[in-house]
Regions:
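Active-site flanking loop/helix segments enriched in acidic
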Residues: 2-25, 57-67
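An amphipathic alpha-helix signature
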Residues: 2-6, 27, 74-78, 82, ...
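Alpha-helical phosphate/pyrophosphate-handling elements in metalloenzyme active cores
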Residues: 16-47, 82-88
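Histidine-centered active-site/metal-ligand motif
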Residues: 22, 54, 73, 105-106, ...
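His-Asp-centered metal-binding catalytic motifs of divalent-metal-dependent phosphohydrolases/nucleases
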Residues: 44-63, 77, 99-106
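Helix-adjacent hinge/juxtasegments
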Residues: 59-96
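Histidine/acidic-rich helix-loop-helix segments that form or flank divalent-metal centers
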Residues: 90-128
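Single conserved hydrophobic/aromatic residue that forms the stacking wall/gate
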Residues: 126-137
Length: 137
């Protein structure tokens, strides 16, 4: 279902395997947890889509402002996500919710749905990801 979107996101983040691996992990866990929580089909589609695109504003934030904190990700990410969703097509039914989720995935108050709760928690996955490989002799 999301193959074209995944391909577009991989192309957008080309040259940044850390970001690509992160959104693939977040998407995989979002799909698993969403199914376990028995989310509706529409909510699943929005959650999975937002999981793929949730950090899409990072590169633009670094380019424009020299930073990529949550505020920047939320602000720039929703604009870039809209463009990608329009170019890929097939997401008109969830585009508004997806951009809402992206615009709030670093806002930890007023959580308005299970999809947002799941995305917020999963976006924290990167905290436990190693930033470099260590050699143990």
């Amino acid at each position: 279902m999301h193959e074209r979107l995944l391909t577009a996101a991989i192309e957008y983040d080309k040259g940044d395997p850390k970001r690509i691996q992160h959104f693939i992990k977040v998407h995989s866990f979002a799909r698993l947890i969403g199914k376990q929580e028995k989310l509706s089909d529409e909510m699943m589609k929005a959650l999975e889509t937002a999981a793929i695109l949730h950090d899409i504003g990072i590169h633009e934030g670094e380019r424009l402002y020299g930073r990529n904190d949550g505020e920047i990700q939320q602000k720039l990410g929703l604009v870039i996500a809209k463009e990608i969703l329009e170019s890929v097509g097939g997401y008109e039914d969830v585009a508004e919710r997806v951009t809402h989720l992206i615009a709030r995935h670093h806002t930890y108050t007023d959580i308005d749905g299970k999809d947002l709760q799941i995305l917020i928690e999963l976006s924290l996955i990167h905290i436990s990801e190693p930033t470099r490989l260590l050699s143990i002799s």
